[in-house]
């Protein structure tokens, strides 16, 4: 099944996003990725307040990485694309590509997420409507207990 197409997330880099060197502080690029994730969930029709309220189901990020390619500065326009992929029945990975206004890639990031049921933090299947958005992982992926 093809993933549901969503619009790219866009934002302007603010002064508060930068560090003393005048470039975006490294951790803020991961924040921008999470903003793009939240925007994608909203586009899918997910009630964000309920999704992030820990009301029985939690979807923590279990792994994050980012590679910086070019700096971003205050006032730059940023575009974030997301490539979603199912890893197994309860885990998925999002690959983010961040672009500046000129279309240059400035960073590539990945986050892995796991769906857990409270209070015992048992793994559960990825909830609707996310499965339709996620691409299937290659056959090597399995339901492992990472």
Curated annotation (Swiss-Prot):
Q: What keyword terms does UniProt attach to this protein?
A: Hydrolase
Question: Which GO-annotated molecular functions does the record name?
Answer: 1,4-dihydroxy-2-naphthoyl-CoA thioesterase activity; fatty acyl-CoA hydrolase activity
Q: Which residues form the active site?
A: 19
Write the Enzyme Commission number(s) for this entry: 3.1.2.28
Position of the signal peptide: none
Query: Do you know which Gene3D superfamilies this protein is assigned to?
Result: Hotdog Thioesterase
Entries under Pfam families matching the protein: 4HBT_2
What does it catalyze? 1,4-dihydroxy-2-naphthoyl-CoA + H2O = 1,4-dihydroxy-2-naphthoate + CoA + H(+)
Q: What class of enzyme is it?
A: hydrolase
For this chain's UniProt record, which GO biological process terms are given? phylloquinone biosynthetic process
Could you tell me which pathway this protein works in? Cofactor biosynthesis; phylloquinone biosynthesis; Quinol/quinone metabolism; 1,4-dihydroxy-2-naphthoate biosynthesis; 1,4-dihydroxy-2-naphthoate from chorismate: step 7/7
So what does this one do? Catalyzes the hydrolysis of 1,4-dihydroxy-2-naphthoyl-CoA (DHNA-CoA) to 1,4-dihydroxy-2-naphthoate (DHNA), a reaction involved in phylloquinone (vitamin K1) biosynthesis.
Which PANTHER family does the annotation name? Answer: 4-HYDROXYBENZOYL-COA THIOESTERASE FAMILY MEMBER, ACYL-COA THIOESTER HYDROLASE YBGC
Q: Which family does it belong to?
A: Belongs to the 4-hydroxybenzoyl-CoA thioesterase family. DHNA-CoA hydrolase subfamily.
What is this protein's record name?
1,4-dihydroxy-2-naphthoyl-CoA hydrolase
Where is the organism placed in the taxonomic lineage, from the top? Bacteria, Bacillati, Cyanobacteriota, Cyanophyceae, Acaryochloridales
């Amino acid at each position: 099944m093809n993933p549901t197409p969503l619009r790219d997330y866009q934002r302007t880099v603010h002064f508060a996003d930068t560090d003393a060197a005048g470039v975006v502080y490294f951790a803020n690029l991961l924040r921008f990725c999470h903003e793009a994730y939240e925007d994608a969930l909203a586009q899918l029709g997910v009630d964000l307040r309920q999704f992030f309220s820990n009301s029985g189901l939690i979807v923590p990020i279990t792994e994050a990485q980012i590679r910086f390619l070019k700096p971003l500065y205050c006032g730059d326009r940023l575009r974030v694309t997301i490539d979603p992929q199912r890893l197994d029945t309860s885990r998925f990975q999002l690959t983010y590509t961040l672009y500046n206004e000129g279309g240059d890639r400035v960073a590539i990031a990945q986050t892995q997420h796991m769906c857990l049921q409270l209070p015992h933090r048992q793994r559960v299947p990825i909830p609707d409507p996310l499965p339709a958005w996620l691409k299937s992982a290659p056959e090597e992926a399995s339901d492992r207990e990472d």
